[in-house]
Amino acid sequence: MKDRNHTFDFLCGLCIIRMISLHVMDFCGMGEVQWWTHVMEWTFYFMSFFFFKAGYFNKGVNNSPTGEYIIDRTKRLFIPYMSAGIIGMIIYFSFLPAMLDKYHNPIEPLSWDHIWKTSSFYGNRPTWFLFSFFVTYLVVHFIEKVKGLRWIAVLFPLVSYLLFLYGNPLWMDANNVFMGIFFFYLGMLWKHIMKRFSRSSIIIVSIVMIIAFLVLNVVGHGEYTMSINSFKGSFLMTMLIMVLAICGLVGFFSSVNLPRVPVIYYIGQHSMVYFISHYPMLYFYKFMHLSFGRSIWNRPEEVFILIPAVFCLCTWMVPLIERIPWLSGRWCKS
């Protein structure tokens, strides 16, 4: 099988496991527990990995006419983004009358500017990723129209950082798109480098990069939260750590012929289903408990219930959702 089926699905699986676990911890009020914050400090770069992967496996974003390309990206990303978001909103607002009746407030603040300021939906906040992914693909398509313009992507992390310093002014949370484009092109570049050198050379370089990442993340730790385009610590150190971690892990696991890891591999292979499904489940569980006057906040035992329950439900839903193109983005080829 191709390296993608092993290396990238393994890493995608780890990303999804980390993301769902993070959201469960936050829902249960355990997001600031010390041991968990350490986990986040060592895995903060995982969301950027999806953009890196898209660039690595890019077969040419400029091979199709612009109209056809936009339609294809709309079907694969924007329609699932809207569909998953609307489903989340239906679940969220279905419980709103009960919350107002019982607690005299909507539990979480509601505002009209949420519609244009953010790309997330009430009830399914992680959908921001699909919108940013969609915009990234479109921008890259037009960048590729101009020969040599792709190298401007080297400056895009700085653009995202400046936007962060100025309060992330772009609507629809588009401030992180520049980081997405940078990692998209980094994926393309790293694949090109890996093809030009021997497997043993890539293994050695990757090990050096991983060791450098481990050292630098201790000496000059910085973090980047892609969902809100937020930088913590030194900008240059954060970018260096992210590049070393992602390129090092991809280079190493691709070169050592990583064997198939059943559960993680499956989650990574069907990551879209887990991604769009888990958050509405968490809201449903939370609001059901609140409806009966019981909170899941600061209850560690709920973490041990929710994590296996969510993964089991998402796994059960894989064949169901993947047959629905407007949710999975898997449309029949004409």
Where would I find each of the regions flagged by the language model?
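Alpha-helical transmembrane segments and their immediate juxtamembrane cytosolic regions
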Residues: 1-334
